[in-house]
């Protein structure tokens, strides 16, 4: 595993423990795990990159943590990890996504266009409404969309 990947995994593991209340504690813990060149500014950048926040743990201590419901999608996030649910009725498809991912995914769906059966999309923060064209059977469009999400890595 690449050194940056190991550092990222160790960093996430520390924050999941909900014990680090300061950046200096994170630096010390990472150094104890063998990351000797880590410093406070690097930890600060990592906290921003991973969307970490300070919040109270079960002992009412202020600690850094990575809330999964607030995770920020990136361009390297597989689509199948960002799509939570797909549902539809006779006239509309609704795709539920991770928070912040709907507009990215709607843009991709819009690029498929009318030839693939998509008349248009409306995206919020975590939901997309998809309107199919008249000429495309709903089941065919659902299958195409599901295949797109499952094949994207």
Curated annotation (Swiss-Prot):
PANTHER family from the UniProt entry: ARGININE REPRESSOR (PTHR34471:SF1)
Pathway: Amino-acid biosynthesis; L-arginine biosynthesis [regulation]
Homology family: Belongs to the ArgR family.
Gene Ontology molecular-function annotations: arginine binding; DNA binding; DNA-binding transcription factor activity
Organism: Haemophilus ducreyi (strain 35000HP / ATCC 700724)
UniProt GO cellular component terms: cytoplasm
Functional description taken from the UniProt entry: Regulates arginine biosynthesis genes.
Subcellular location: Cytoplasm
Protein name: Arginine repressor
Pfam name, any one: Arg_repressor
Key word Repressor present: yes
SUPFAM superfamilies: C-terminal domain of arginine repressor, Winged helix' DNA-binding domain
UniProt keyword annotation of Iron present: no
Coiled-coil region(s): none
GO biological process: L-arginine biosynthetic process; protein complex oligomerization; regulation of arginine biosynthetic process
Keyword line: Amino-acid biosynthesis, Arginine biosynthesis, Cytoplasm, DNA-binding, Repressor, Transcription, Transcription regulation
